[in-house]
Amino acid sequence: VNEVVGEAVMYFRKRIPRNVTLDYNGLAIAPIEANINPALFEWVVENLMKNALDALQGHGSIDVRLSMDDQNVMIDVKDTGKGIPKSNWKRIFEPGFTTKTRGWGLGLSLSRRIIEEYHNGKIAVVESEPGKGTMIRITLKRFFDA
């Protein structure tokens, strides 16, 4: 997981404005294993970072963090952007829902489908406050060799 997320971060880092910082802790921790489709999973991480960048409106920070417990791998994408009202926390994952003037509202719904149906995981807003930012978490089962 570290490597795939790291590749997405490196790709994305080259495309962000100077007024935006992008931090990633995944290369500094031990390898984390989960059963993923690398191409689909990388697309989801890139989509979350792109949404975070859009929410920043040109300046702020995006923080991508990996962590794990006994059973799960958690990937957090946190921004210091405009935030999401609590009433929309679940709605943002519905097809067609968007707050952008340009967009189809399909990125997060497709992300949810990829995480839930192809990776047996979960994706959710875990914290957000209008004017302060948002954190979205992907949770996957850890992969253990038999």
Each language-model region and where it sits:
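A conserved beta-strand-to-alpha-helix junction within the catalytic ATP-binding
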Residues: 1-9
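Glycine-rich ATP-binding loops of the HATPase_c
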Residues: 119-127
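Short helix N-cap motif at coil->helix boundaries in the Bergerat
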Residues: 1, 83-91
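Short beta-strand/loop element within the Bergerat-fold HATPase_c
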Residues: 59-71
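Conserved catalytic submotifs in the C-terminal HATPase_c
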Residues: 21-32
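Acidic ATP/Mg2+-coordinating residue in the GHKL
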Residues: 79
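Detector for a conserved hydrophobic position within an alpha-helical segment of the HATPase_c
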Residues: 115-116
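Short alpha-helical Gxxx[C/S/T] motif in the catalytic ATP-binding
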Residues: 107, 111-112
